[in-house]
Swiss-Prot record:
Keywords: Cytoplasm, Methyltransferase, S-adenosyl-L-methionine, Transferase, tRNA processing. This is tRNA (guanine-N(1)-)-methyltransferase. Belongs to the RNA methyltransferase TrmD family. HAMAP family: TrmD (MF_00605). GO terms for molecular function: tRNA (guanine(37)-N1)-methyltransferase activity. It comes from Hydrogenovibrio crunogenus (strain DSM 25203 / XCL-2). Signal peptide: none annotated. GO terms for biological process: tRNA N1-guanine methylation. It catalyses: guanosine(37) in tRNA + S-adenosyl-L-methionine = N(1)-methylguanosine(37) in tRNA + S-adenosyl-L-homocysteine + H(+). Pfam families: tRNA_m1G_MT. It is found in: Cytoplasm. GO terms for cellular component: cytosol. S-adenosyl-L-methionine binds at G113, V133, G134, D135, F136, I137, V138. It comes from the Bacteria.
Amino acid sequence: MRFDVITLFPEMFSALTESGVSRRAYQDQLYQFKTWNPRTYTTDRHKTVDDRPYGGGPGMLMMYPPLKKTVDAITDEVGEKPYVVYLSPQGRPLTQQKLSELQSHSNVTLVCGRYEGIDERFIETVVDEEICVGDFIVSGGELPAMMLMDGMIRLIPGALGHNQSAEQDSFSDGLLDCPHYTRPVEVDGMGVPEVLQEGHHAKIEQWRHEQKLLRTKQKRPDLYTAYLAKHTETQDK
C-alpha cells in the first residue's frame, strides 16, 4: 500500500509517521508514504498555486496546472496512474465500508484542497473520487486526509498487532462497538458485568452482540435501521 499526498503543508503529516499505529506500521514497512507540494511544479518565481475564480466571488482557487503536474510526477514515480481522491465537502461520506473499498487500490493519491477549493477541470479529468469526512468545513484537506489514511492503515494486515482488533472496531459489521472493561473489577462502587468474568466464550460473544445492538439502537438509530434491513434482506434470500 502506498499513499501520496498533494498538500501545501507537508509538515502536518509528520504526525502519522511519528506516533501510534501509523508510526509502527510505517516502521514495519507495511505502507509507503510521500508528500508532494504543488509549489514545486509552478513556473513563476512566486511559486503561485492559486488565483481568483472566474465570475467573481470571495477567496481563491487552487489552479489546475500545478496540481496536474504533481499527479503526473507521482504517476512517473509509481509507474502507473494512482487512484486519486480529493477530500471535499461535496464528496461521498467516509465510512468503514468505504475504507475497505479503498484497500483494493495499491496506490492512492490524496489531494488536499485549500482556499475556496480547486479548479473544477482538475476534478473532472484527474480525480477518481471525492470523499467527505463530515458535514462541516475545515481549513483544508490535510486533517481529513490524515483521518482517511489512519483508517486505511488500521486495515492493513499486521498493522494492529492482533488480527481481530480491526474486526471488532465500531462499524466493522455495521454496528457500534460494545462496552469494554478492564481492571480493577470494582471502582467507585461500579463493577464489571458477571458474564465477562466467567470465561464462557459463547456467552460473552452473545452478550457483546446484544450490547452492540442495544448501543446502536440508542445512539445511532440510522445505523440500527440499516443493519436490520440488511440482515432481513439476507435472511429472505
